[in-house]
């Protein structure tokens, strides 16, 4: 039976001019510590196939409590403190709840 309590987050990052390498490094630095969180089901980084690529994080957590726990970690707070200088615009974040999903 699929778990209908999980939470999926899609976060899209548009790097400021000449900041893509630093943004990528910052986002990649979040992968290992986030994946080790007990409530993290997946945490995957993608890039768009556009001339000036954006980065997209596809995150899945066991439930809302796990997402909130993620947002209180030291690595999340350190990442947020460095993020704004690397962006051309604010991060676009969508938090999704399952309606009809497999797994």
PLM region spans:
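Glycine-rich beta-strand-turn "strand-cap" elements at beta-sheet edges
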Residues: 1-7, 45-53, 81-103
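Residues at secondary-structure transition points
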Residues: 2, 14, 18-21, 52, ...
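N-terminal first-folded block
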Residues: 3-45
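Short, well-ordered beta-strand segments in beta-rich or mixed alpha/beta enzyme
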Residues: 7-14, 44-71, 92
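An amphipathic, aromatic/His-enriched active-site/gating alpha helix that lines ligand/cofactor pockets
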Residues: 29-41, 60-94
């Amino acid at each position: 039976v699929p778990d209908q309590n999980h939470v999926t987050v899609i976060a899209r990052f548009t790097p400021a001019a000449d900041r893509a390498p630093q943004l990528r490094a910052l986002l990649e630095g979040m992968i290992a510590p986030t994946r080790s969180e007990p409530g993290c089901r997946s945490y995957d980084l993608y890039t768009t196939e556009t001339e000036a690529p954006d980065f997209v994080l596809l995150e899945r957590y066991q439930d809302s409590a796990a997402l909130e726990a993620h947002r209180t970690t030291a690595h999340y707070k350190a990442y947020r403190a460095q993020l704004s200088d690397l962006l051309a615009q604010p991060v676009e974040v969508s938090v999704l709840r399952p309606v009809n999903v497999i797994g």
